[in-house]
Swiss-Prot record:
The keyword Cell membrane applies. InterPro entries: DUF986. Belongs to the UPF0266 family. Keywords: Cell inner membrane, Cell membrane, Membrane, Transmembrane, Transmembrane helix. The gene is yobD. The chain crosses the membrane at residues 6-26, 45-65, 67-87. It comes from the Bacteria. The lineage of its organism: Bacteria, Pseudomonadati, Pseudomonadota, Gammaproteobacteria, Enterobacterales. Residues 27-44, 88-152 are cytoplasmic. This is UPF0266 membrane protein YobD. One of its GO terms (cellular component) is plasma membrane.
Amino acid sequence: MTITDLVLILFIAALLAFAIYDQFIMPRRNGPTLLAIPLLRRGRIDSVIFVGLIVILIYNNVTNHGALITTWLLSALALMGFYIFWIRVPKIIFKQKGFFFANVWIEYSRIKAMNLSEDGVLVMQLEQRRLLIRVRNIDDLERIYKLLVSTQ
């Protein structure tokens, strides 16, 4: 096993740990989930480039008769990238005292102002940062509003 294979195993383990945390651990942290809203995905061009580069590496490894374990590890990395970027749905998870947005816990007390833009983006102003929340279904904005009013 080469250093390349060890690095590939490390990246696969990191992506797998992130996927497990995102799917199973995060929804159970900080109390029961009051509301989970699916969000719009950002540009997918980055994911296409990532998976495309991995496919090029697989092709290069096969044509140069590289190690079979490296080909399998590259394939596993491509599948993990495909899952993370294309299958997994980003979401905002509301709890009793705060919410998870982009896997970061934000307490309700940190929200200084909220606005709704013309194109349906909820803008939350924190102390030093703005959150742009793009929901998949525009009706979910009303559900978020009702939840925030009832918890504040």
